[in-house]
Amino acid sequence: MMKKIVAVCLFLGLSLYANAKDTIVVLDTNIGKIELKMYPKVAPLAVENFTTHVKNGYYNGLKFHRIIKGFMIQGGDPRGNGTGGESIWKKPFKDEFANNVVFDKPFLLAMANSGPKTNGSQFFITLAPTGWLNGKHTIFGEVVKGKDVVRKMENVSVSPGNNVPMFDQVIKKAYIKK
């Protein structure tokens, strides 16, 4: 009987451990891989939207269409110009904010938007603390590996005035790390 109890406890413990594992999304770009840890407890809608798009291949072949040195790199627009993209629900979704998750460091992953409750498919990665964005953009993850790739991308030449990279910065493939 004791062996059965130990076996059940061990099984339950392993199940809880498996469920506690972080979801990591990999953006395999033309200059290297960026690994992003998701924040599902902070922003469940944004994480569901992003990871579902990843699983469906939505981001494959899309460009980082806007790069502002010292601020952020932005992607996720199928039009490639900052005017397109939609959520998995085919309509914008609400913002998700947490008082303890703020733009206080570089390498945060957040939803790009055009105002309150306008989240779609576009996202950005910060390159510095950007406190003025608190309460305006949903943070739903962070870069955990490939920060050097993000910094390389930050330093590519861009067109003056519109911050479009002179050479395409492409997400060759986005996928969930196993």
Over which residues does each language-model region extend?
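Bacterial N-terminal signal peptides that target proteins for export
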Residues: 1-6, 109
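Cyclophilin-like peptidyl-prolyl cis-trans isomerases
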Residues: 13-178
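Sec-dependent N-terminal signal peptides
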Residues: 5-14
